[in-house]
Design a protein with these regions (language model features):
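Generic structural signal for well-ordered, non-membrane alpha-helical segments
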Residues: 4, 17, 57, 147-150, ...
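Short, solvent-exposed polar/charged micro-motifs at secondary-structure junctions
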Residues: 46-49, 150-152, 181-184
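Short, solvent-exposed coil/turn elements at secondary-structure transition points
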Residues: 11, 41-43, 108, 121, ...
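ATP-dependent adenylation/nucleotidyltransferase module used to activate substrates
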Residues: 1-90, 95, 125-133
Length: 192
């Protein structure tokens, strides 16, 4: 099958979350990868049960699906790294009572799209160091909802866990595939 690469940037017109589009476009084109900029918006009052961060993320994801379909693509590679995945795991456990996170590969049949996360085993610190070495320009982040986000709190939790155990991130990663159902409440027919 053919591989079509695109660098897609989805902007939110109603949030002052800025990226240097010329820089991103230039970098992408230097690699021979076409750059697509797509703008959308969301109204945080449409669903007060969901956080603005969730609504923004979901609307950006839908926009990515739209662009992918328009470009004739059926696979989207996202830049989530190991820290993102572990922070999401901790958020879902803490706030949703669910043992779930962002998988490295997710087939979304409803959209006929597959999401992959090729950097899922890379530490955020390693990406920051690589960006520094390569001289990448830091992008502007000025989201009015960022201070309300639980993700920054979970980043601190992950850091605290690593202070207690330097291998904590690897233990968290391993626990996602090392579920001992017989030792969990509600998983055994004889429980409660």
């Amino acid at each position: 099958s053919d591989v079509y690469k695109r660098q897609v940037h989805v902007g939110m017109t109603n949030i002052p979350y800025q990226s240097d589009l010329e820089y991103l476009k230039g970098y992408s084109e230097d690699l021979g990868v076409p750059f697509v900029h797509y703008e959308t918006f969301f109204d945080p009052s449409t669903d007060t049960r969901k956080s603005p961060c969730f609504l923004c993320s979901w609307n950006r994801r839908k926009a990515l699906f739209t662009v992918a379909k328009e470009q004739g693509c059926n696979k989207i590679a996202l830049g989530h790294h190991m820290d993102d995945i572990l922070e999401t795991l901790l958020m879902n456990i803490t706030f949703q009572g669910a043992f779930s996170t962002m998988p490295p590969k997710l087939v979304m049949r409803k959209f006929e799209m597959t999401i992959i996360r090729p950097m899922c085993l890379v530490h955020e610190a390693d990406l920051i160091e690589m960006a520094r070495i390569r001289g990448f320009r830091k992008q502007i982040k000025d989201c009015p909802y960022e201070s309300l986000s639980n993700r920054s709190n979970m980043k601190e939790v992950l850091y605290s866990l690593e202070k207690m155990n330097p291998e904590a991130r690897y233990s968290l990663w391993k626990c996602m595939t090392n579920i001992q159902e017989e030792l969990l409440p509600g998983m055994n027919e004889h429980d409660l």
